[in-house]
From Swiss-Prot:
Signal peptide: none annotated. It comes from the Bacteria. Keywords: Cytoplasm, Phosphotransferase system, Sugar transport, Transcription, Transcription regulation, Transport. The keyword Ribonucleoprotein does not apply. The gene is ptsH. GO terms for cellular component: cytoplasm. Belongs to the HPr family. This is Phosphocarrier protein HPr.
């Protein structure tokens, strides 16, 4: 899940910080 969050953040949808 952490990896997914990182990908999402890199896409530009910085909705949640990397926990």
């Amino acid at each position: 899940a952490i990896k997914v969050f990182h990908i999402v953040a890199e896409t530009g949808i910085h909705a949640r910080p990397a926990t």
